[in-house]
Amino acid sequence: MIRLSDVVKEYEIGTTALKGISLRIEDGEFVFLVGPSGSGKSTIIKLLTGEIVPTSGQIAVNGFSLTNIAERQIPLLRRSVGVIFQDFRLIEKKTVYENLSFAMRAVGSSPREIKKRIPYVLELVGLEEKTDRYPNELSGGEQQRVAIARALINNPSTIIADEPTGNLDPARSLEIMRLLERINH
């Protein structure tokens, strides 16, 4: 579950990004945050991942209070939240398998867990035949599916997607949205 209560975020340059935002998202909900550029969507994502802290208000994600989270708890929070970025953020010099393995090793997964989980997740996103490919050998839609696989690889309870179809054509966008909806059910 995600809960924001009267959240305010002001940046040092005097810009107020969020003012008094309250929101509750229950487990299993599929929610879209929409709004024009500069409306605070990216700020909310950064708050939910612990990248930044609110100026005031309360934020809870998967049982973690982000208002006063201890530094040592941030890796635990990040394990429970998978993030899909608009620009994919894949490691260009690593294969699909290596990109996913890297994400698993970062949270302490064993080689055995890695070997078992990666084929399962690649099948889930329809990329089981692309395991040895590098990002530059994949289409934009395939790269986005690798980014989704990376978000899923550590079995998070929450997935946050920052404009997951922003760099894709309409057909690929629909494919990605259907994949995300299927994963949610």
Predicted regions located by residue number:
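Catalytic Walker B motif of ABC-type/P-loop ATPase nucleotide-binding domains
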Residues: 159-162
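A short, flexible loop at the N-terminus of ABC-type nucleotide-binding domains that lies
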Residues: 1, 10-20, 70
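Short coil-to-helix segment of the ABC ATPase nucleotide-binding domain corresponding to the Q-loop/switch region
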Residues: 94-101
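Helix-to-loop junction immediately C-terminal to a conserved catalytic motif
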Residues: 49
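A short, proline-enriched helix->beta-strand linker immediately N-terminal to the Walker B motif
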Residues: 87, 153-157
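Conserved ABC transporter NBD signature motif
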Residues: 57-65
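Conserved ABC ATPase signature
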Residues: 134-138, 142-144
